[in-house]
C-alpha cells in the first residue's frame, strides 16, 4: 500500500468564507436548490449535469450577451466529441467581457494593468484608459479594412501593447495569433504562414538579461514570407526601424508606429465598440507541436474561452474581482492568454517583460510584492532554479498578499512542493495545474475546498470529466493510465486551421478512444480523488 504523503496546506475558515467558491455554492443553493458539502460531490454534479453546470457558470459570472435572456437558446445543442455545439444563439465578444469593468463605476478608475520591463519605467493603465487605447487601436484596424475573420498576428513580448492589440482584434471579430520575439524566423513562419495574417503587430527587438537583441532583420525576413500582409504595426523597442519601414514602403504595406499612434491618440478618451459574435466564433489560434510536421494551429472560440476563463479564475485559482494576478510567461505560451483572460474576472494583471532573475532573483519577487499580487504563477523549471540557488523569497520580500501560487508546464516534484511552503509561504494554495494549449483549459487543478498533499495535484477541475483509462478504455483507480476527458468542454478547439475535414483534429485526440479526448499524458487517480500527473504518454 502506498504511503499517504503529508498534508502541506488547508484553507482556513476565513479563507473559505471569502472564497468565490463559497459564493458560487451559495448561488447554487439559492437559485437551484442544490447543496454541496464537499468538493467531490460538487465535481460529480458538474460532470453528471454538464448543461446545468455550464448554465450556472454563465449566470453566476454574468456572461455579457446581446441575445434575449438568458443570453442563448440552448446550452448544449450537440454533445458529440468532436463537434459539440455550445450556447447556440448567444451574441458575445471576448473583448467586451474583459473590458466591461471599464464601465463599472467602482472599477473604471482602478488599475487594470501594471507593467515592468528591463528598460522602461513601470507603467500602469486604469480600466478606463485601457479601454480607450483599445478603442484607438480598433479604429486603426477598422480604417485599414480589418474585419471579422481576418487574422492579426503578433511578434510581440509580454507588454500592455500586446494586450491592447489582442483586445482591438477581438472586438472586431478578427482572429489573434501571437509568437514571442525570441523565436527564430523559421519557427514563427511555421506558425504564421499557415494562417495567412492580414496584420502583423511586431517589435524590432527586445531586452533580456541586460542585453538588447536586434530582431529587425528577422522581422523583415518574416515580412517577406507573408504575402497576405496588408498592415504592419510596429512598436519600436530598440529603435532599429528604418529597414523595416523602408521594406514596408517598397512593398506597399501600411506602416504604423504604434508608440507614436498611441501617444497622439491618448490625448482624448474613446470607447470601443464590439461586434456581437456567436459562441463558436474563432478568437485566437494557438500552436501545439505534433510528433511530426508543422505545429498544430488550434482555433479556440470566444465563448469557450469566456466561460472556461471565468470558471477557472474564480473556482480554481480562487481570485476575486479587484485582486491581482501575475503569471511569468511569454506571448508564445497559452499562459499569456490565460493572464490576459484574468481581466474578464475583474483582476488587475501584472506583466513582467524580461528575465525574471536579472539582475537577481529579487526582480520577480520584488515586483509581485510591491504590487501585492494575490496570485503568482511560475513554472516548475523556475522553482527548480530557485531550489538550486537556495533562494527563499520570504527572506527578501513581503508576500503577505499572496493567496495562490500557480505552477504549470511540467509536473512539479515533491521537492518543489516543499520549497513553496518552506521558502515562499506556509499559507498559500499551491495550484499545480495540467491541461493547457490544446483544450484551452485545465483538466486537473486546484480547489480551496481541498487539502494539498506533498507532490500531488488536488483535483479534477469542475466540468472536466477526467479519467485515467487503460488500453481498453476502462477507468482506473490507484493505477497509472491515459489521461482522457469523456465529456465535451466548451473551450475545446473549434477546429484546426486549414483542416477542412477535421482529419488532423480527429487524429490528434480521438483515434484511440472514439468519442473520448485522449490528451497524451499519463495520470493516476487515487481513491482519495487526488491526482498525480506523469510524463507524456506520447513520448
What are these regions (language model features)?
Residues 28-34, 76, 98-126, 240-243:
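AMP-dependent adenylate-forming
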Residues 171-260, 371, 379-380:
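Structural core segment of the AMP-binding/adenylate-forming
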Residues 173, 304-324, 334-374, 389-391:
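Conserved AMP-binding/adenylation subdomain of ANL enzymes
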Residues 109-111, 234, 249-287, 294, ...:
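Conserved pre-ATP/AMP-binding loop-to-beta segment of ANL
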Residues 315, 369, 403-529:
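Conserved AMP-binding/adenylate-forming
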Residues 40-45, 95, 109, 113-167, ...:
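Conserved AMP-binding/adenylate-forming core of the ANL superfamily
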Residues 119-121, 285-297, 313:
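Conserved adenylation A10 loop of the ANL superfamily
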Residues 157, 199-218, 239, 354-357, ...:
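Adenylate-forming
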Amino acid at each position: 500500500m502506498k504511503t499517504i504523503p503529508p498534508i502541506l496546506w488547508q484553507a482556513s475558515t476565513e479563507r473559505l468564507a471569502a472564497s468565490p467558491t463559497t459564493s458560487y455554492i451559495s448561488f447554487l443553493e439559492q437559485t437551484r436548490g442544490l447543496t454541496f458539502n464537499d468538493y467531490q460531490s460538487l465535481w460529480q454534479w458538474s460532470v453528471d449535469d454538464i448543461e446545468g453546470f455550464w448554465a450556472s457558470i454563465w449566470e453566476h459570472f454574468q456572461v455579457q450577451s446581446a441575445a434575449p435572456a438568458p443570453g442563448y437558446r440552448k446550452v448544449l445543442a450537440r454533445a458529440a466529441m468532436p463537434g459539440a455545439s455550445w450556447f447556440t444563439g448567444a451574441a458575445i465578444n471576448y473583448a467586451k467581457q474583459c473590458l466591461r469593468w471599464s464601465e463599472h463605476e467602482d472599477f473604471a478608475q482602478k488599475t487594470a494593468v501594471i507593467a515592468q520591463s528591463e528598460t522602461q519605467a513601470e507603467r500602469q493603465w486604469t480600466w478606463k484608459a485601457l479601454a480607450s487605447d483599445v478603442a484607438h487601436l480598433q479604429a486603426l484596424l477598422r480604417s485599414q479594412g480589418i474585419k471579422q475573420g481576418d487574422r492579426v498576428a503578433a511578434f510581440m513580448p509580454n507588454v500592455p501593447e500586446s494586450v491592447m492589440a489582442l483586445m482591438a482584434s477581438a472586438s472586431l471579430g478578427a482572429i489573434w495569433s501571437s509568437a514571442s520575439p525570441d523565436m527564430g524566423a523559421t519557427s514563427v513562419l511555421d506558425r504564421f504562414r499557415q494562417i495567412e495574417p492580414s496584420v502583423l503587430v511586431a517589435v524590432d527587438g527586445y531586452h533580456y538579461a541586460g542585453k538588447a537583441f536586434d530582431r529587425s532583420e528577422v522581422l523583415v525576413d518574416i515580412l517577406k514570407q507573408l504575402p497576405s500582409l496588408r498592415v504592419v504595426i510596429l512598436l519600436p523597442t530598440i529603435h532599429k526601424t528604418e529597414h523595416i519601414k523602408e521594406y514596408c514602403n517598397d512593398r506597399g504595406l501600411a506602416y504604423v508606429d504604434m508608440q507614436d499612434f498611441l501617444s497622439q491618440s491618448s490625448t482624448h478618451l474613446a470607447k470601443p465598440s464590439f461586434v456581437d459574435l456567436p459562441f463558436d466564433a474563432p478568437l485566437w489560434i494557438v500552436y501545439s507541436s505534433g510528433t511530426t510536421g508543422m505545429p498544430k494551429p488550434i482555433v479556440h472560440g470566444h465563448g469557450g474561452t469566456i466561460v472556461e476563463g471565468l470558471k477557472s479564475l474564480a473556482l480554481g485559482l480562487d481570485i476575486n474581482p479587484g485582486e491581482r494576478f501575475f503569471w511569468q510567461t511569454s506571448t508564445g505560451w497559452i499562459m499569456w492568454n490565460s493572464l490576459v483572460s484574468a481581466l474578464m474576472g475583474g483582476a488587475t494583471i501584472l506583466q513582467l517583460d524580461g528575465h525574471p532573475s536579472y539582475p537577481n532573483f529579487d526582480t520577480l519577487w520584488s515586483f509581485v510584492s510591491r504590487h501585492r499580487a494575490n496570485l503568482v504563477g511560475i513554472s516548475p523549471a523556475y522553482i527548480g532554479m530557485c531550489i538550486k540557488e537556495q533562494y527563499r523569497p520570504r527572506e527578501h520580500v513581503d508576500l503577505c498578499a499572496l493567496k495562490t501560487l500557480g505552477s504549470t508546464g511540467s509536473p512539479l516534484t515533491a521537492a518543489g512542493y516543499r520549497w513553496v511552503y518552506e521558502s515562499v509561504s506556509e499559507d498559500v494554495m499551491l495550484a499545480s495545474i495540467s491541461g493547457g494549449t490544446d483544450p484551452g483549459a485545465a483538466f486537473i487543478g486546484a480547489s480551496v475546498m481541498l487539502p494539498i498533499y506533498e507532490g500531488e495535484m488536488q483535483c479534477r477541475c469542475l466540468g472536466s470529466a477526467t479519467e485515467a483509462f487503460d488500453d481498453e478504455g476502462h477507468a482506473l483507480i490507484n493505477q497509472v493510465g491515459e489521461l482522457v476527458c469523456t465529456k465535451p468542454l466548451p473551450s475545446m478547439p473549434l477546429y484546426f486551421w486549414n483542416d477542412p475535414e477535421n482529419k488532423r483534429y480527429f487524429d490528434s485526440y480521438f483515434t484511440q478512444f472514439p468519442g473520448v479526448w485522449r490528451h497524451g499524458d499519463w495520470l493516476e487517480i487515487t481513491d482519495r480523488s487526488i491526482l498525480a500527473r506523469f510524463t507524456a504518454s506520447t513520448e
